[in-house]
Regions:
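Membrane-helix interface motif
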Residues: 151-164
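Hydrophobic cores of alpha-helical transmembrane segments in multi-pass inner/ER membrane proteins
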Residues: 18-25, 111-120, 189-203
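Alpha-helical membrane segments and adjacent membrane-interface helices in multi-pass membrane proteins
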Residues: 55-114
């Protein structure tokens, strides 16, 4: 889920270049912000990145797979969570899950789920137990990620910058609409699965390792 399995040469050049620029800008800012973090935080980043990589390699149906992005966002926060998303997407690209040119866009799409997860969880945790708060956090985080994915698809369907600025590509808009209509049921299925997994893991951590939770 929330990952573009698109080969190199398909997306407009300007789009994936912008994706790389934004992804590396966010990664540089996160690296600078966390430059004095404790070593165990980096260990947790590596461990959760490995879990995310494994989850994203196992499909649960057409078009979708688990991502563990909400869980990673809750445990690591927006900055380290985005670094995990970037590293995982780069590794998946080397394994053939999408081209190298879409790594930046994939990091942004997955980062859209990671970044809001901890703030939303903290807000919900004031009124809910960890498991239930995690489930609702997963739904909200993945909604942001799917929205980012649809934005990328819509921009890709517009083709070059001239078509985008002219806003006259009706065929591209229709193609985007068909994709949204076709894919929505699969996103719902994946979101439910992600919410259940996130809820289960957070409930477990709350009992055995509560210090890991924000």
């Amino acid at each position: 889920m929330t990952h573009l399995h698109i080969a190199d040469g398909v997306l407009p050049t300007w789009l994936w270049i912008v994706g790389f620029a934004l992804a590396f800008a966010f990664a540089a800012g996160a690296s600078f912000h966390h430059r004095h973090d404790r070593p165990d935080r980096l260990t947790l980043l590596a461990a959760l990145g490995a879990v995310m990589l494994l989850a994203m390699s196992v499909p649960i149906g057409p078009l979708v797979h688990l991502s563990f992005a909400p869980m990673v966002g809750i445990l690591l926060g927006p900055g380290l969570g985005f670094l995990a998303a970037l590293l995982v997407n780069a590794t998946l690209a080397l394994l053939g899950h999408g081209g190298l040119t879409v790594v930046g866009l994939n990091a942004l799409v997955l980062g859209a789920a990671v970044a809001p997860a901890r703030p939303v969880y903290r807000l919900l945790r004031k009124r809910m137990k960890p498991g239930r708060a995690g489930a609702f956090t997963a739904v909200a985080a993945l909604a942001c990620s799917v929205a980012a994915l649809y934005v990328v698809i819509a921009l890709a369907n517009r083709g070059d910058l001239a078509s985008l600025l002219a806003d006259d590509d009706h065929a591209g808009a229709q193609a985007t609409g068909r994709f949204v209509l076709f894919s929505s049921p699969f996103w719902v299925l994946a979101t439910v699965a992600e919410a259940l997994v996130t809820s289960s893991v957070l409930s477990f951590l709350a009992r055995v390792r509560p210090e890991l939770l924000p």
